[in-house]
Amino acid sequence: MQNYFQLLELPQEYNIDLKILEKQYFAMQVKYHPDTAKTAQEKAQNLITSTELNKAYSTLKDALKRAEYMLLLQNINLNDEKIRSLLSPLELSIFWDEMERIENTTLFSDLEKLKNKYELMQQQNINSLKQAFVEQNLSDATIYTSKLKYIRTLQSKLQEKIKSCK
C-alpha cells in the first residue's frame, strides 16, 4: 500500500486543504485513467493506481478516517477495544448518557439542538486533533481520534432518530 499523501502529492499533515486535496485527486485520476493507457499492462497498472487514488481520496477527505490513517502510519491501530480503553469511565458514562438522551428525545426541535451540540463537539475535537498532530503528540492524537469516533457514533444515532421522527 502506497502512502496516500505521497500518492496524491500532498504534505503528510492532518490539517490539509480539502480543495487542494480534491484538485490533486482529479488531476491524478486524469493522469492515471485506465482509458488513457497505450498497452494492456499500462491499463492494468493504471486501474490499480486509480483504485488506490479512490481509497486515498475517501480516506483523506474525512477527518476521522484521516486521523486513523495518520495514526496507522505511526503503527497505531485503533480497534474498538483499544478505543474503549482510551477514554475514562467518566467520558464513557457521558457518551452513554448522550445515547440515552437521543433515545428519549421526542421533539424535533430538541433533536436539532442535539445536532448542533454534536457538530460543535466534533469541530472542537477536530481542532484539538489538528493541534495534537502539529505538535506530533501521538498520545493526544490517539485520544482525540477515539473521541471523534464516539462523536460520530452519536451523530449517526441522532440522524437515525431524526429520520424516524419525520
Swiss-Prot record:
Gene3D superfamilies reported in the protein's UniProt record: DnaJ domain, HscB, C-terminal domain
Gene Ontology MF terms: ATPase activator activity; protein-folding chaperone binding
SUPFAM superfamilies (alphabetical): Chaperone J-domain, HSC20 (HSCB), C-terminal oligomerisation domain
Keywords noted in UniProt: Chaperone
Pfam families: DnaJ (PF00226), HSCB_C (PF07743)
Top-level division of the source organism's lineage: Bacteria
Domain J: start-end pairs: 3-73
GO biological process: [2Fe-2S] cluster assembly; protein complex oligomerization; protein folding
UniProt xrefs under PROSITE patterns: DNAJ_2
UniProt cross-references to HAMAP family, sorted A to Z: HscB
Function of the molecule: Co-chaperone involved in the maturation of iron-sulfur cluster-containing proteins. Seems to help targeting proteins to be folded toward HscA.
NCBIfam families cross-referenced by the UniProt entry: hscB
Subunit and partners: Interacts with HscA and stimulates its ATPase activity.
Family (UniProt): Belongs to the HscB family.
Protein known as: Co-chaperone protein HscB homolog
Native source species: Rickettsia prowazekii (strain Madrid E)
